[in-house]
C-alpha cells in the first residue's frame, strides 16, 4: 500500500496543555480544536478539495504529527495520546474548499521510556493510527486487565496489535489477512480440497478463507515470511486466524457493563478484550505458546490441522470444519505448502425411529489407519464403539423416537493422530395407535411401486414398542443387513419380519416385493 501526503508545518495558537487536557471520561478532550486550528492555518496554501478521493464530500483524512512525546509512552498527561477520531464526535464542524473535514489522525514526533530518553519515534504508531482511517480495528486488548485480564490478541504479528512497536516502532509488520479482508484489498480464495502453496501475504495479498456454518464466523489462512517488515516474526510459516463477527454472545464487557455479541465487539473496539473469548485470535500451532515462533505451522510434531488435532479446526460451538490441512511445510522461497482433504465424509441418510445407519468414506491418503471410533450422544448419554479399519458403516440401535442426536466418526491413524466428522440427526416420530409395519421409504422404486433390482431395504420395523428381537426372511430363507446396514433386493420375493416382544407375544409382517 502506498500513501501520498501533502505536509505543512503549523504553530497552534494555544499551549499543548490546553489541547492535551484529559477529562474524567476521555483523554485529550480538546484535541478536536487542535485539528481545526491546524486545518484553518493550512487552508491558506492547501486546497482541501483535492483530498476527497472517493468524492463523498469529505476530506479523506487529516494527519497531525505533534511535536514532543506521547502520553501513551508514559509522558505527562498534557501530552497527546496517539489516536484516530472524527470531528463530528466532538460536535465540531469544519468546511474548507467545499469539503467537510471530519476524519483525523494524530501521532507524536518522539518516543520515550516513561517520559525519559526521548528519541525520534519510529513509523509503527504512525502506521497503526493511519490504518484506523482506512477502517482497520484495534486488535490488542483495549481494556487492559478488565474483562477477565489481558488477552494475547495477535501478539506482535499485527500492525493493529503490538506489532506497531516492533524494533521500537522502526519495523512494523506487513498487513495481514485480517487487514486485507477488512479492506477488501487482497486476493481471497475459499479453502477447498486440493494442494496449496501460499506465498507470503505481503507479496501478492493472497490468503484463504473458510466460513463456518455460523454467519460471521470464519477462519483465515496466510503465509508470513520473517524478512523485511516481518523480520521480527521468528521463522514465519502458516498463520491461522479464527474470526468471529457473529451475533453470538461474546462475554461480559467491564467497560460497557453488559454482555456483548461478537458483532458488537467489532463495532465498539472491544474485539480482543476477553482472554476466554477473543473475536480475532491466532489459532496457535502450540496453544501454550510463549514464543512467537510457536504460533506458526509447521512446528515440531505439528504438521496437520484438523478437527481432532491440537489445536483443533473447529468453530466456537465445537462443530468440525470437515476439512484438514495435511503435511504443512515451509519452502526455501518463504512460501508454505499443504494439502486440504476431507478426512471423513459422513452420510446419515438412514434414519429410523429407534436406529440410524451411519456411513462414511475417508481420504485415500489416510488409508494407513488403526480403525474408527463411532460416537453418538443425545446431549446427556454418550456411547462409543471401536471398529476395524475396513468398516465403512455402523448401525446405531436402541435410539429414542423423535430425539436429536449427534454422531461423530473418528479416524484413528497409526501414529495416534485422529481426524473426525460430526453430524446431527433426529430420529423419526413414533405414531401412537398405529400398527407396526415394514419401513420401505427411501428405497429405489419405479413409478408403479415395483423395486429396481439392487434396491436397498433397511430391514426396520416402525411403530412397534417393547420389541425383544426381529428375525428377517426372504422367500423363507433367513436374511440380514449387509455391511452397509441394508438388505439388497435382487429379485422378486416375499419379505417376512418375525417380531418377538418382551412380553412373550409374537407377530409376523409379510410384504411382497416385486422387481422390474
What are these regions, as identified by a protein language model?
Residues 1-169, 176-181, 250-252, 256, ...:
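Active-site-proximal segment of zinc-dependent metalloprotease catalytic domains
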Residues 2, 74-116, 183-345:
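Non-catalytic C-terminal accessory/binding modules of secreted extracellular proteins
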Residues 354-367:
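Conserved aromatic anchor
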Residues 365-384:
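Extracellular low-complexity, O-glycosylation-prone stalks/linkers
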Residues 396, 485-493:
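Solvent-exposed segments in extracellular or luminal domains encompassing
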Residues 398-415:
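Beta-strand-rich modules
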Residues 407, 495-497:
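Hydrophobic beta-strand segments within extracellular beta-sandwich modules
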Residues 414-429, 507:
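Extracellular fibronectin type III
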